[in-house]
Amino acid sequence: MLIDLHVHTLKSADSSLSPEDMVREAKRVGLDGVCLTEHGGGWDRHDFERLASRYDMLLIPALEVDTDMGHIAVFGVGGYAPGMAKVRDLRRIVDAAGGFMVVAHPFRRMFDRTTGRNFLFPDADGQALTARQAAEHPVFQLVDDVEVGNGGNSPRENGLAREVADMLGRKGTGGSDAHSTHGLGCFVTHFERDVRCVGEFVEELRAGRYTPAQGLLQGKLRPLTTDSHPALT
């Protein structure tokens, strides 16, 4: 089962993607589900239930929380709660809900500072930072996994995330970070079992029965790992 774990709709102020266009494009490219990782407060539960009931596709409500240690994708939590801006407090909130946390695009702007600074290492020389040094950042001990494939990242930024995830023994996740139909599904997460609801989705994440993947849009789906593997089927 293929799910894009990182998508923004009009509920995020910086997105131009309507739910209707999202579902249409997701079906066209071969996705089985989409996570709506909205900025801010995300969807009201009742509004989301009405939205999801309109489409023959798995839609997962989620949040992308702006914290003191970068952006964290949160799954299995009802909505925004006070204290989420601090990662350690966010960890407690997510644990209480039985949810799952993924650090999103951890090395964005690490190697090209012309558009801003990296969230985790604002003063570091990205050219000199090793994966082992990067893996020592405390955020990686507070999250459940690392986003290793993000459509808004450069290959080098995603590559460093993959190296860090490997060092930490994490599976890694994939998501497009789409804010329009462009690139939706460019990175996905392949689940070993079918998922029919949020509860099952979080259960599969916590069990580690998933693999980040790329190549769906080119018709050559393959695991997003540091080694060479045969294409997923």
Name each region found by the language model.
Residues 39, 64, 106, 178:
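Short, ordered loop/turn segments at secondary-structure junctions
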